[in-house]
Design a protein with these regions (language model features):
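Generic structural signal marking isolated hydrophobic packing positions
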Residues: 2, 21, 180-184
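Metal-dependent amide/peptide-bond hydrolase catalytic core
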Residues: 102, 106-191
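Histidine/acidic-residue-rich, glycine-tolerant segments that coordinate divalent metal ions
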Residues: 3-4, 16, 20-140
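Alpha-helical transmembrane segments that form the membrane-embedded catalytic/substrate-binding core
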Residues: 5-9
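Short glycine-rich or small-residue beta-strand-to-loop segments that form or flank ligand, phosphate
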Residues: 1, 32, 148-150
């Protein structure tokens, strides 16, 4: 649905312009493209740089299965990369010399799946393997997972995010690897 954002907002601006002209209303309509929608940081950067300072109003939209004004609560969210570093080795000749970064990432993700039962019902933890290293016959020395950690309250997101961090650190200890935790973006809930 995100491919509809630009086309939809341009159509709305054209319709608004026609309506304003037909009623003799003077004003300026500006359309902004807001990058990084999925990581919720584009509008923050634009706001911090003063892009919206002289606006009387701002209207945004997002594709949905029905057309309505939303009064939804937008969740607090952390987006993080968990980057595991290990030691590469040949998987059939000397696997004992390797320390698998991919094993660490998998153990972390398994742990987080067990964690889901022990967090409030509105907490969501989504992940994807972003980079898993080398061919199957090589113990991978690098793996990266990307996480979205969300909740309707910032305090719950903070708690879940810390717990996910601890799973990552524990997985690194279990596999004798190391982990770098990279915060990509973070935002509070919006009501």
């Amino acid at each position: 649905g995100h491919n509809l954002l630009g086309a939809g907002v341009c159509a709305a601006a054209c319709a608004l312009k026609a309506d304003m002209e037909s009623r003799g209303i003077h004003g300026t309509i500006r359309v902004y493209g807001c990058p990084a929608d999925e990581i919720m940081s584009g509008k923050i950067v634009m706001n911090n740089r003063g892009v919206f300072n002289d606006l009387d109003t701002a209207v945004t939209w997002h594709p949905f299965d029905r057309n309505r004004v939303s009064n939804d609560i937008w969740q607090a969210q952390d987006i993080k990369n968990y980057i595991f570093h290990g030691i590469s080795a040949h998987a059939s000749r000397s696997p004992e010399d390797g320390r698998s970064a991919l094993d660490a990432a998998e153990l972390m993700n398994i742990g987080v799946n067990y964690l889901r039962e022990h967090v409030p019902g509105d907490v969501r933890m989504h992940y994807a393997y972003a980079d898993n290293g080398q061919p199957a016959n090589v113990v991978p020395d690098y793996a990266r997972t990307n996480y979205f950690i969300r909740s309707s309250r910032r305090s719950r997101t903070d708690d879940a995010s810390l717990r996910v961090d601890n799973w990552a650190k524990g997985a690194a200890v279990m596999t004798v690897t190391s982990v770098v935790i990279e915060l990509v973006s973070s935002c509070k809930e919006m009501k």
